[in-house]
């Protein structure tokens, strides 16, 4: 049967609050895959999708065309997707000319486990829910929908899940247009479907997962969380998605993406080959292997450090370049740290003060920062660098010539793309030996704050502790400055505290402050 699929995707996603600040809600991550992928992958490759877009339209267009180059998408730009006159029905009606045949309607926040039947007849999807109050519902008699109810309906009703097959498309479009002044714009597809009841609408049960509000999204993520073996801490302005045996990196920063793509050519052979990119995303083939963090061992870590010596090729600089590099390091370490600490205080409404951390009285953070020998810190060693070197970004390859692949490389070092400071890679590696993303993701840490008294604790893996001990020996045997690595590790915690969620942000800040106190 020939039919199309309409995925409504023009709205703002207000019920998700700040989570849809940078992307359309269709791209909200579920087990490191956008919600809309769970919809697209329910259908055969030859099915065409018609997608009305408005809010953050480019993010949907870019993601779908990058991730599914062999599928057909027709994007309909909706001119009015917020404010007076806008509504789900308005967005749907902009797609009429593309849907002059039976079609399936689905919202972009509806995920179901079962196969979705073609629209050989009119049908509406429903599910059993504990609370129907926030959903439209269906009254069903003798295996037919007899009433499409408004939100809050009482009695024996089933929640309508925003998924329907529309066989009588001509009648549907006629009623949607006739009802512009009677509510079709605000109500949406349910308005047109009400007029198809007399032609019979089959109720179809589904196992349903909603992603359109915070509470439902949390339940959906909990169900799907084991679908991918990765420990990626969520960020507001970045995402990594796994889809169709590909990896998609997203960032709101277009310069970030452009620089990442360029740098991938500088470090070719050590990182995945980027196959395609847009202004906010790039895509590469998923590498077969296991992230180092899953099963770290001393023997593999030793092998990795030997391999990295092939990567860390030192760059010879002339006098002017040396001076410029030192200034870049000073700005990258000192200026950025002061800026990020101020950002942390603003974001989490904290103040700089003397505090008792794990029973020890510690001065203000800016007093500690002022004690650092920044001249020494800025005296970097210029090498080919990675920039975010921790075990989640190191893949142990299961095939191919190279034993490892480096992931999620930094786009530049203070504006420099060809080289950066080897000590930054050392500190990044060290910070990941102390804090395990996997254990943080499982909430195996605690932070208690009462006035100026703070207690924190976090679980560590014994094999990572052993790797940390070996790393100290390795650095000292290679005549690198271990104290400098420790200082920079503390600075990394202070820098990233402003970028992560509460209360993990507190752990990072107070761990960094505590480490710095012991060093300076």
Region annotations inferred by a language model:
Residues 1-60:
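N-terminal glycine-rich phosphate-binding loop and ensuing alpha1 helix
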Residues 2-5, 159-242:
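Conserved alpha/beta core of the MobA/IspD/sugar-nucleotide pyrophosphorylase nucleotidyltransferase superfamily
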Residues 65-140:
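Conserved beta-loop-beta/alpha segment of the NTase-like Rossmann-fold superfamily
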Residues 111-184:
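Conserved core of the sugar-phosphate nucleotidyltransferase
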Residues 231-262, 280-281, 285-286, 290-295:
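ATP-binding glycine-rich loop module of kinase domains
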Residues 240, 368-420:
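Active-site acidic catalytic loop and adjacent metal/ATP-binding pocket
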Residues 265-271, 291-356, 362-378, 385:
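Conserved kinase catalytic-core helix
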Residues 412-473, 490-504:
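Active-site activation/catalytic loop segments of kinase-like enzymes and analogous catalytic loops
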């Amino acid at each position: 049967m020939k039919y199309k699929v309409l995925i409504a995707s023009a709205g703002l996603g207000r019920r998700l609050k700040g989570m849809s600040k940078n992307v359309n809600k269709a791209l909200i991550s579920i087990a490191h895959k956008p919600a809309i992928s769970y919809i697209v992958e329910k259908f055969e490759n030859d099915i065409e999708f018609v997608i009305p877009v408005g809010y953050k339209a480019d993010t949907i267009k870019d993601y779908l065309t990058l991730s599914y180059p062999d599928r057909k998408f027709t994007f309909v730009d909706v001119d009015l997707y917020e404010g007076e006159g806008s509504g789900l029905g308005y967005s749907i009606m902009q797609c009429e000319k593309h849907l002059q045949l039976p079609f399936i309607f689905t919202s972009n926040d509806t995920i179901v486990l079962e196969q979705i039947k073609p629209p050989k007849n009119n049908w509406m999807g429903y599910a059993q829910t504990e609370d129907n109050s926030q959903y439209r519902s269906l009254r069903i008699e003798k295996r037919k929908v007899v009433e499409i109810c408004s939100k809050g309906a009482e009695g024996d009703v089933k929640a309508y899940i925003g998924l329907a097959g529309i066989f009588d498309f001509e009648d549907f479009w006629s009623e949607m247009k006739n009802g512009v002044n009677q509510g079709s714009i605000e109500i949406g597809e349910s308005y047109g479907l009400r007029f198809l009841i007399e032609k019979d609408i089959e109720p179809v049960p589904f196992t349903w997962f909603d992603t359109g509000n915070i509470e439902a999204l949390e339940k959906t993520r909990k169900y799907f969380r084991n679908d991918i073996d990765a420990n990626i801490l969520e960020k507001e302005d970045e995402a990594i998605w796994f889809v169709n045996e590909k990896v998609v990196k997203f960032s709101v920063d277009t310069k970030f993406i452009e620089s990442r793509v360029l740098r991938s050519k500088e470090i070719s052979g050590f990182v995945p080959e980027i196959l395609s990119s847009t202004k906010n995303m790039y895509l590469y083939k998923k590498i077969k292997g296991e992230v180092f963090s899953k099963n770290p061992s001393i023997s593999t870590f030793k092998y990795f450090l030997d391999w990295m010596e092939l990567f860390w090729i030192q760059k010879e600089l002339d006098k002017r370049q040396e001076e410029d590099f030192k200034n870049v390091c000073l700005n990258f370490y000192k200026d950025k740290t002061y800026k990020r600490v101020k950002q942390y205080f603003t974001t989490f409404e904290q103040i700089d003060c003397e505090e008792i951390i794990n029973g020890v009285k510690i001065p203000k953070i800016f007093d500690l920062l002022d004690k650092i020998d920044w001249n020494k810190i800025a005296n970097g060693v210029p090498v080919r660098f990675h920039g975010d070197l921790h075990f989640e970004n190191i893949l142990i390859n299961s095939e191919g010539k190279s034993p490892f692949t480096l992931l999620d490389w930094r786009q530049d070092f203070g504006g420099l793309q060809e080289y950066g400071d080897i000590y930054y890679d050392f500190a990044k590696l060290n910070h990941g030996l102390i804090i395990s993303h996997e254990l943080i993701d499982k909430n195996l840490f605690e932070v208690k704050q009462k006035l100026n008294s703070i207690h924190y604790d976090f679980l560590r893996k014994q094999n990572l502790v052993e790797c940390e001990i070996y790393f100290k020996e390795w650095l000292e045997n290679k005549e690198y400055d271990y104290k400098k690595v420790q200082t920079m590790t503390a600075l990394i915690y202070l820098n990233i505290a402003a970028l992560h969620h509460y209360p993990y942000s507190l752990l990072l800040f107070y761990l960094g402050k505590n480490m710095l106190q012991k060093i300076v």
